Amino acid sequence: MNQVMRRSACCLLSSLLLWSCVGCTKAAHESFGDGSVQSDSENDEAAKQAYKAFTVDALDRVAVDDLNSSGKLVLVNKLGAKSVHGDDAISFTKTVDDSNMYYVISMCKQKEQAPYSFVLYKDGQPHTLTTREACTSNGIETISLPAKNFPDATSLSIINIGNTDLVVSVYEVKKHHHE
């Protein structure tokens, strides 16, 4: 099967798998009622500046600020980060505790609309976090997934069909427990 057919099949499969994960993604400026997914960017200006810089460091500053100000999630470890054009993967530096969550923050730029996916891998076994039809306009997005839903993931693959630039950071976070 040629590469175009494989990518098309992979994109279709990712789209189908997305329905098993409905509700685990959100845009940075979208409200979400159940609180299971990370909070919005508290500082819109910081998010705009990060998008303008379009670097891992700028994205990480927004992620840390959001986590520190959310009161809902606490940063445990940074698992990895990368600036990506095309398909790529981020290998995790640590194993995530099953009681914690994977937390992916990203920003995206495209010259024309094209789909992309984030897929967790463990021993060659995939778990699609999200498939997007295109980038959101000038936004930062977050996705979280309880680690118990896909324990011991070793990497996050970025399946990027088209002319898409992404900056992606992956963290381990846990729910904040008020005493």
Language-model regions: role of each:
Residues 2-12:
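Bacterial N-terminal signal peptides that target proteins for export
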Residues 19-23:
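C-terminal motif of bacterial Sec signal peptides marking the signal peptidase cleavage site
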Residues 32-94, 177:
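Transition segment at domain starts
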Residues 93, 103-109:
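Short edge beta-strand/loop segments characteristic of extracellular beta-sandwich folds
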Residues 100-104, 146-165, 170-172:
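Noncatalytic modules at the cell exterior or secretory-pathway interfaces
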Residues 107-116, 162-166:
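Extended, low-complexity, turn-rich repeat/linker tracts enriched in Gly/Pro/Ser/Thr and Asp/Glu
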Residues 112-129, 170-171:
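Short, surface-exposed beta-strand/strand-loop-strand elements in extracellular ectodomains
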Residues 121-149:
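An anionic, turn-rich surface loop/hairpin at beta-sheet edges
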